[in-house]
Swiss-Prot record:
Membrane-topology descriptor: Peripheral membrane protein
Cofactor comment text: Binds 1 zinc ion per subunit.
Residue span of region Disordered: 298-321
Family: Belongs to the queuine tRNA-ribosyltransferase family. QTRT2 subfamily.
KW Membrane (keyword) present: yes
Function: Non-catalytic subunit of the queuine tRNA-ribosyltransferase (TGT) that catalyzes the base-exchange of a guanine (G) residue with queuine (Q) at position 34 (anticodon wobble position) in tRNAs with GU(N) anticodons (tRNA-Asp, -Asn, -His and -Tyr), resulting in the hypermodified nucleoside queuosine (7-(((4,5-cis-dihydroxy-2-cyclopenten-1-yl)amino)methyl)-7-deazaguanosine).
Gene3D superfamilies xref list: Queuine tRNA-ribosyltransferase-like (3.20.20.105)
Name of the protein in question: Queuine tRNA-ribosyltransferase accessory subunit 2
Upper classification of the organism: Eukaryota, Metazoa, Chordata, Craniata, Vertebrata
InterPro entries referenced in this protein's UniProt entry, alphabetically: QTRTD1, Queuine_tRNA-ribosyltrfase, TGT-like_sf, tRNA_ribo_trans-like
GO biological process: tRNA-guanine transglycosylation
Record note on quaternary structure: Heterodimer of a catalytic subunit qtrt1 and an accessory subunit qtrt2.
Amino acid sequence: MKLSISKVANGARLGVISNIGRNGDKTLEVPGCLLYTKTGSPPHLTHDTLQTIEGVPAVTHITLSTLAEHQEVLEEYKEGIGKFAGMPDAVLYCSTHDPVSPCPTGYNTNKAVSLWGAGGRIEMTAQKFISAQRVLRPDWFQCLSDGEVTPGGNSRKRVKKSVDRTLAFLDECLQLLSGHEDLKPCVLIGAVEGGDLLEERLRSARETAKRPVGGFLLDGFHGGSAEKELSLISAVTAALPEDKPRFIHGMGRPDEVLECVQRGVDLFDSCFPYRVTERGCALIFSHCYRPDPETAVLEKSETSGAERNGDVGAESEEPDADRAEMTSFEICLKEKRFREDFRPLLEGCSCYCCRNHSRAYVHHLLAAKELLAGILLMIHNFQHYFRFFGSIRAALRDGEINALAELIRKQSS
């Protein structure tokens, strides 16, 4: 795996990761995102349906927490999760946890990290972890780490222990890896821990960079774009080598993505469009930093604040918890005001859903609890999100990243 940076603007890095995959014949542009999956499959979608989506990332994101309990089956299969899940040619990145599912805290020890799957808790020692990676056969995988500590709410002693444990797990995994020829083509991604303590974040970053890892995961950030988190991200990326990619999980809102991109982060998960789909919502934010004057007025009226968030008191079947999580970048199609709205989800969108169906139809599917609702929303939300990353790269090439950041900022609540 080789990262080539072609341009740096306001901290944002434009480049290409080449020589990826078992055959080293694929590339991934950065800034970019990964294709989020549940147990190896894109949520709501078949692989045939996935082919209808434009701009699908070259790297697929799988999660050890959802696959560890199926290890015996995969051991019998003997050909890895890629072929088992119908993706024999996919480049796979395996993270330890599913960014969508919060993990209970207080279960990690010096010897093992706790994973949480459908069947409950699974204790993962370094030996078991490497054994699982040999069965899954990913191209990249996040090293085992004590990621329970997040910014805020942890003692200094607990934060320091998190960093110490993570470095110990990294050293043990590297030692175990050296004894397995079948894992030599795999790239190990080191995790940077440290909660909200700058000195511990920097210690974790510098010590991890001394080890032979292929990239870095900025772990323990879960969105909100708080100034404290953003300043920590800036400090960590400044301490990392420039020739290796930086990953982050849990920062998926468009405004969060741009804040992180401008602080040197390269790769993101694509959990955000999945969360939006699960709320019965559709992404409608604009990422066109050079709008067509003929359509600018239409787009402005289409994506007004009321349009995105819904009118106050709008009738909806949306649970209160879901409404609280809604962002200004989406509309809730469960609201009854869409019953007779025969426009596409987003004017100008070329996805299958917008070309063939209306807001009213998706509203009906949601009201009737039809499975097709999730399929159509996932198609639209994935494609819109993937195109957003294309706009980020184009804005960097054109020297317009500040214009794009301002456009997104104006749409954020």
